A protein has these predicted regions:
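Conserved secondary-structure micro-motifs at functional edges
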Residues: 1-133
Length: 133
């Protein structure tokens, strides 16, 4: 199956997010983050957005930057922000099975080869959010 995705980078690796779940991409000063109940949040005008740092989730050292790149993702009626190092753009990808070592791990939906020939893991948005409840 072909899946429209948004490619994002965390550390040296590229990951694919299903485009249907992407609401918007924000850039916010790192100093604008707040904390609620032990979790990072971003105060928006109309609501507070819970954040998941993809780099921390993956165990990758974050690139220190005064400006955060946040991909806002939809999960059911809720939204959350995924902090990434950079957004690489949209790409339609062919979904392939996960490598054996990653099967059954929460947060991964499949794998794909992207335009530059590298493998990118397709992230399961529900699995990423699952650790926040």
């Amino acid at each position: 199956a072909i899946l429209p995705t948004l490619l994002v980078q965390a550390g040296e690796d590229v990951y694919a997010l299903p485009l249907a779940r992407v609401m918007e991409v924000l850039h916010a000063p790192a100093t604008s983050l707040g904390w609620f109940d032990g979790r990072a949040v971003l105060d928006r005008k109309t609501h507070t957005l819970a954040l998941v740092d993809l780099r921390q989730w993956l165990g990758v050292t974050p690139t220190l930057s005064p400006l955060l790149t946040i991909v806002v993702l939809q999960v059911g009626e809720a939204r959350f922000g995924l902090v990434v190092d950079q957004v690489r753009g949209r790409e339609e990808v062919v979904i392939k099975p996960l490598p054996r070592a990653l099967r059954g791990l929460r947060g991964y939906a499949g794998a794909t080869l992207i335009g530059d020939g590298r493998m990118a893991l397709i992230l399961d948005v529900d699995g990423l959010r699952g650790g926040q409840d």
